[in-house]
Amino acid sequence: EFPSKKDEGTGYAFRKDGQLYVGSIKAYNAKKNAWERTFDIVNAIKDIIDEFDLKDYHMAIETPIMGRNRKHSITLANCNGYFIGAIDGLVNGYTFIDNSKWCSYHLISGKREQRKEESLELLKQTGLVPLDCKDDNMADAYNILTYCEHLG
């Protein structure tokens, strides 16, 4: 059984004026290809940057995890490049964060499903989301934010 793709997308998290914001951008649409989904994510991120005036912010981007499917991995890398090109200049630079680094910092381990659960647990402990929240993209974004804040 394959997991549903309806929850595919990306999470975001930032602090502004002492307030923590977390959310996610749902990008999956069976009628759209990877490029079109990336375009939707870019536009949503641009809207967030504009709405919250985040142009002075430095963006952390999780390093894409390449799978076994070569064609898919190349598309993922190309879409990531498109994303970076589109947001470059809209924020004050960006840094790639390896999944292994932020997971290790938060003591998250195990296989993918277990890591998702542990990531979600950390977000739920903030009280920002309901206890039945299943949005691991948002959870990962929050945990990447707190990892980056720890780095200084």
UniProtKB/Swiss-Prot annotation:
Pfam families the record matches: DUF3882 (PF07066)
GO molecular function, one term: nucleic acid binding
InterPro entries associated with the record: Lactococcus_phage_712_M3, RNaseH-like_sf, RNaseH_sf
Source taxon at top rank: Viruses
Stretch forming the signal peptide: none
Protein name: Uncharacterized protein near lysin gene
